[in-house]
From Swiss-Prot:
It holds the Pfam family Proteasom_PSMB. InterPro entries: ARM-type_fold (IPR016024), PSMD5 (IPR019538). GO terms for molecular function: protein folding chaperone. Keywords: Cytoplasm, Nucleus. The keyword Cytoplasm applies. It is found in: Cytoplasm; Nucleus. Its main location: cytoplasm. It comes from the Eukaryota. GO terms for cellular component: cytosol; nucleus. The lineage of its organism: Eukaryota, Fungi, Dikarya, Ascomycota, Taphrinomycotina. The keyword Nucleus applies. This is Uncharacterized protein C18.17c.
Length: 488
């Protein structure tokens, strides 16, 4: 739509809405209850043919936000009214001033609606003026987490263009940090950490301008958690990782030293969020932290205290080839009590949710020789325990058991193919929908595995397996509804 020309011909619902608003002062308690339905009727009357005349009510619809009525019908009407309009069209109606007001509205839905509408602007052409941009920045401080998160994503995307990145730098000063509470500091630090990953130049500017204030020496738990999250964000780009891992900043050393302290929500966050991601992206750094700070020993000591976080983390370590090789080098494979996977841990793998979650991670090991090394030291009843757990009444336990069975089917399907009880379980037709899908997926994965596939010795079960794979996961006539009803 290149231009909007207001023409006569407003539909009847539009005229009725205007009349209701005109009569509102005479009987407000009655008329105000009719307005939401009138707005809905007006929305239904908007068509490509009537839209030009309906746009004459834009001011009127926007004024309805001031009434004590639900905001949903107003936003739906606005959404349909403005749907095909470009930012240039919207600017002809003075949309920026409306949006500045809308971003201060007490309704979260209205604020988010306005933030979404701003995405129609061409940021490369600098179509967002400074007053509106400042209103977007103010949304970071909103009482609504949803509004703050939406504004953060919007500013992050706009900062692809240096003009808006520089506006953020210009409008935010170090003094702002000094007067902010912990919640707001967390929001702004998170935004600046994300912006730092866009380019080395942005990182340099944020550091030079005291925007990226990363401080690991905090007593406030919110800031402690945010310290971990900020470093986690900066793992993602090579240049930000180089910065946080340098000898100058020593942030990784701080993380490792803090993790060795007492178990609390801060160190749990390190073990659950930061170290697994570091292991995935930069496994050599994990080994380096062990050489400098005996990180592996610290994790194993925490595991002995039944610490679920460290048990999960160790499974992540075992899923990485580089880290697993370092564990074997340090602890060996012979001493059952102290080897790289202690005997007690192999039993814990099969006991509870943290143990089985850790086991599922460990079975992701991509190196086949290391995968088989792990399998050889597992308890003899590992497969039977997994099959039994796959029938557990607890949904999460079933899911984890099948997750492990899927990894086994992919990496060493002979372990399942050689056990009749396991094949019989996978061929069962009854069960809830999810269970039937998972059984089918394990069978399918076995047949497609590069470690045997169709050549596996299925014996008398071969025809049944092929038939099931042709039928699909849900067998016609199987009593899945009964089980599903019992589960519900």
């Amino acid at each position: 739509m290149d231009s909007i020309e207001l023409i006569p011909g407003l539909p009847g619902p539009g005229r009725r809405l205007l009349q209701l608003l005109k009569d509102l002062p005479s009987n407000p308690s009655v008329i105000v209850r009719e307005i939401p339905d009138a707005i809905d009727a007006f929305r239904e009357s908007i068509t490509p043919a009537t839209r030009p005349s309906c746009l004459g009510l834009l001011d009127t619809i926007l004024s309805c936000f001031e009434l004590p009525i639900p905001t949903e019908p107003i936003m739906k009407a606005l959404g349909k009214l403005l749907e095909p309009m470009s930012w240039a069209d919207l600017k002809k109606f003075g949309i920026e001033s409306y949006l500045v007001t809308g971003l201060e509205h007490p309704s979260t839905d209205v604020e988010i609606f306005c933030l979404h509408l701003i995405r129609r602007a061409n940021w490369e052409k600098k179509e967002i003026g400074e007053p509106l941009f400042e209103a977007i920045m103010a949304c970071i401080n909103s009482r609504s987490i949803a509004v703050s998160e939406e504004a953060t994503v919007l500013l992050f995307d706009m900062a692809d263009f240096p003009y808006y990145f520089n506006l953020i730098i210009k409008r935010f000063t170090f003094v702002d940090y000094e007067i902010m509470n912990s919640t707001l500091r967390v929001r702004w630090l998170t935004l600046f950490a994300k912006l730092s990953t866009k380019s080395p130049e942005y990182l340099e500017e944020l550091i030079k301008d005291d925007k990226l204030v990363i401080n690991g020496d905090n007593k406030d738990i919110l800031l402690q958690i945010n310290f971990v999250d900020v470093l986690g964000i900066m793992l993602e780009a090579p240049f930000t990782y180089e910065y946080i891992s340098s000898e100058k900043t020593k942030y990784l050393d701080t993380i490792a030293q803090d993790y060795k302290g007492s178990a609390d929500s801060y160190t749990d966050h390190i073990g659950l969020k930061f170290l697994p991601r570091l292991c995935e992206l930069h496994p050599d750094a994990i080994n380096s932290l062990d050489e400098k700070h005996q990180l592996f020993d610290a994790v194993r000591e925490r595991m002995k205290t039944n610490d679920a976080t460290s048990i999960l983390l160790y499974g992540v370590f075992l899923s990485n080839t580089v880290v697993t090789q370092a564990l074997i080098k340090k602890y060996g494979i012979e001493d059952e009590a102290n080897r790289y996977v202690p005997r007690w841990l192999t039993r814990r793998f099969l006991m509870d949710e943290p143990g089985m979650s850790s086991f599922a991670h460990a079975l992701l090991q991509p190196d086949h020789n290391l995968w088989m090394q792990l399998w050889r030291i597992l308890p003899p009843n590992t497969l039977s325990t997994l099959v039994n757990t796959a029938s557990s009444p607890i949904p999460r336990s079933r899911q984890l058991a099948y997750q492990c069975l899927l990894h086994i089917a992919q990496n060493s399907p002979i372990q399942i193919a050689s056990e009749g009880f396991a094949i019989r379980h996978l061929l069962e037709a009854e069960g809830d929908h999810e269970t039937c899908l998972l059984r089918f997926q394990v069978l399918k994965t076995m047949m497609e595995s590069p470690h045997g596939g169709p050549k596996l010795p299925f014996g008398r079960y071969r025809e049944d397996i092929l038939k099931r794979l042709q039928q699909g996961p849900i067998v016609s006539g199987a009593s899945t509804l009964k089980v599903a009803a019992e589960t519900a």
